[in-house]
């Protein structure tokens, strides 16, 4: 990642890499992580993944998601990204976890440090997908034990999927209902 060498306000040389304060104008410079949000959209025991249609990681499978807009809550960003990429409206639930990674624009820009926040999400029955070909080449639904290996962002997506799978394994199973004993009470008379 190329670090800034000059102040973005007054163009004076910076005395050190960020975080640093410019000696000439007192402007602070930081390399903050860019917030990103994604949704692990489940349908029963299956997870939806999208095959990326653009770089970086064109052709690799990914969790639907992307950068948060200015002042956009990560939950809202996750819902928006799923809708933009797949046409689905989802209900975002609890946080699965957070991971730090980098996002490379293939030489167009310095790599960005990203803070990636992932949420559990569900989609209503009968919902139809609509692919945005600029973003997504394909949508796939995968069982937890059949997730693909060709994954985007290997610095964190494998860990995200592992956490999702471990959550499924740890989830309490519905208990079988015990048969109720027959009531010995007489029914109330009807009025």
Language model features with spans:
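Acidic, metal-coordinating catalytic segment for phosphate/diphosphate chemistry
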Residues: 1-38
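Nudix hydrolase/Nudix homology domain
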Residues: 1-3, 126-191
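A short coil-to-beta-strand element that immediately follows conserved catalytic motifs
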Residues: 16, 89-98
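Conserved N-terminal beta-strand and adjoining loop/helix that marks the start
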Residues: 24-48, 67, 120
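A generic structural micro-feature
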Residues: 31-33, 57-60, 109-115, 131-136
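Active-site-adjacent beta-strand/loop module that shapes the phosphate/pyrophosphate-binding cleft
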Residues: 99-128
């Amino acid at each position: 990642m190329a670090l800034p060498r000059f102040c973005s306000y007054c163009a004076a040389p910076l005395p050190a890499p960020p975080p640093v304060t410019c000696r000439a104008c007192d402007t602070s410079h930081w390399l903050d992580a860019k917030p990103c949000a994604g949704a692990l959209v489940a349908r029963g025991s299956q997870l939806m993944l999208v095959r990326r249609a653009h770089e970086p990681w064109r052709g690799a499978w990914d969790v639907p998601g992307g950068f948060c807009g200015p002042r956009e809550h990560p939950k809202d960003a996750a819902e928006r990204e799923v809708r933009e990429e797949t046409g689905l409206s989802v209900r975002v639930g609890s946080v699965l976890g957070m991971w730090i990674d980098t996002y490379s624009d293939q030489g167009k820009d310095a790599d960005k440090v990203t803070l990636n926040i992932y949420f559990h999400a569900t989609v209503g029955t009968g919902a139809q997908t609509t692919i945005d070909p600029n973003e997504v080449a394909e949508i796939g639904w995968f069982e937890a034990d059949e997730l693909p290996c060709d994954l985007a962002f290997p610095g964190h997506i494998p860990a995200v999927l592992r956490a999702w799978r471990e959550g499924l394994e740890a989830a309490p199973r519905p208990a079988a209902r015990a048969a109720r004993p027959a009531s010995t009470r007489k029914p109330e008379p009807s009025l």
